[in-house]
Amino acid sequence: MRIIFWGTPEYSIPSLDIFIKSKHEVIAVVSQPDKKRSRGNKLIASPVKSIAEKESIKIYTPKKIRGNIDFINELKSLSCDLFIVIAYGKILPKEILEIPKFGCWNAHASLLPRWRGAAPIQWSLIKGDEFTGVGIMKMNEELDTGDLLLEEKIKIDNDDNLNTLTKKLSILSAKLFLNAISILEENIYKNTNSCLLYTSPSPRDRQKSRMPSSA
């Protein structure tokens, strides 16, 4: 598979690393622009960009993606099979979602539809959830509502905190991405059209599981 990887923070690194070491080809990385994060206003690259530079992978750090015709045309020219998206930091518009042959896949760190949206790991800890997990979904224009391709549940240990649980889920995301692609490739070989293992949550389920107000 020819893959373009979208990610920014440390959380994205296990997934990028597993694809770099896999049989798949990471033809480019898209990350957030460098930010001023230290004294002297020095620009610091994102963790994902830093890894891509070390691996000599083509890097894009657009300030704007929606309506960015030059960037969109550049992505189209790369003839990509799949976009892998994990903690990139922006919602991808329709004109980008439609570019890759097999769509855009995202890893979400909760058992959807619970904790759809921002900060799912934090909410699972705040609310004392016994279990959490990762879902791999095919992205659409809405937030965390795409078809669910693969999901795995894990127990939240009593001594888990934000750091330990974040690390567990980032590693699990990487594993599930590869598993989902293996299913896709198997179905391509069998001439079937989809690797769906689950269906999207119903509107009623989504209504029940909206993120609580921070007030």
Give the predicted meaning of each segment:
Residues P203-D205, S209-A215:
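Positively charged, low-complexity/disordered segments
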